[in-house]
Amino acid sequence: MTDTVTHTEAATSKYVNVLEGGTELRVHYNDTGAGKETLVLLHGSGPGASGWANFYRNVDAFANAGYRVILVDCPGWGKSDSIVCTGSRSDLNARVLKGVLDTLGIERAHLVGNSMGGHSAVAFALSYPERVGKLVLMGGGTGGPSQFVPMPTEGIKLLQGLYRDPTLENLKKMLNVFVYDASTMTEELMQTRLDNMLARRDHLENFVKSLTANPKQFPDYGHRLNEIKAPALVIWGRDDRFVPLDVGLRLVWGLPNAEFHVFGRCGHWAQWEHAERFNQMLLDFLGQ
């Protein structure tokens, strides 16, 4: 039986240099070490986000089940270098992830992506299908615009407003619609997120510059989803006010080998709001 280990951000923190468009980027990642298979966790695009901040409730469950867990800070977030993206952010993240995996000598990995991370996982699967084991997509994956909710959604408007005016008040406004139960957003969590945001004002400024240069950072790959043959698990929050539920349905319609699970009483952060059930669901899916 595998010993239960509690992993920390500091103990798993590492860096790698990756070439992107002729520029060398220093990319931060967390790595739990050797495992039977590799599981890569890709975070969303919110201000102050990082691999660890998005998935700290999930790391131990996967690592203690025998997986090597890697959490990548995408360029422009966390401890990675900042960047202005004038093209597809999804494809940029996919290329950087390939560079990270190449450097680490990892030929194949399962990808778990939340929001922007889902978009990036889909872009990676389209460009490098032979490198993907299974896909797990939560609240993202470029299924196209909602058919029922005007775009940009309430949550995306608040997210973009927070980037432009990074205050505690605006952070609270965004987090209050980020999850189903806003009372779980403690003052400590909000302060930590605010500190993470303000520690890297270059990330905030470059995100706004990127939006100005190209408002469509995450292109719609809905018409190409049928090319992805990897088994996929699509997970959504019924009450997601950032990326509505019908976008998840479009993913399932497009992906030829997909399953779909909806959490009730859940917003945009399924892996955090329903961590225990989420963790077991992924382990069951990966073990099939």
Curated annotation (Swiss-Prot):
GO terms for molecular function: 2-hydroxy-6-oxonona-2,4,7-trienedioate hydrolase activity; 2-hydroxy-6-oxonona-2,4-dienedioate hydrolase activity; protein homodimerization activity. Homodimer. It catalyses: (2Z,4E)-2-hydroxy-6-oxonona-2,4-dienedioate + H2O = (2Z)-2-hydroxypenta-2,4-dienoate + succinate + H(+); (2Z,4E,7E)-2-hydroxy-6-oxonona-2,4,7-trienedioate + H2O = (2Z)-2-hydroxypenta-2,4-dienoate + fumarate + H(+). Catalyzes the cleavage of the C5-C6 bond of 2-hydroxy-6-oxononadienedioate and 2-hydroxy-6-oxononatrienedioate, a dienol ring fission product of the bacterial meta-cleavage pathway for degradation of phenylpropionic acid. GO terms for cellular component: cytoplasm. SUPFAM superfamilies: alpha/beta-Hydrolases. The active site is at residue 268. One of its GO terms (biological process) is 3-phenylpropionate catabolic process. This is 2-hydroxy-6-oxononadienedioate/2-hydroxy-6-oxononatrienedioate hydrolase. The record marks 193 as: Catalytic role in ketonization of the dienol substrate (substrate destabilization). It comes from the Bacteria. InterPro entries: AB_hydrolase_1, AB_hydrolase_fold, Epox_hydrolase-like, MhpC_alpha/beta_hydrolase. Disulfide bonds: none annotated. Pfam families: Abhydrolase_1. The gene is mhpC. Pathway: Aromatic compound metabolism; 3-phenylpropanoate degradation. Keywords: Aromatic hydrocarbons catabolism, Hydrolase. Signal peptide: none annotated. Belongs to the AB hydrolase superfamily. MhpC family. The record marks 115 as: Transition state stabilizer. Its EC number is 3.7.1.14. Residues 39-274 form the AB hydrolase-1 domain.
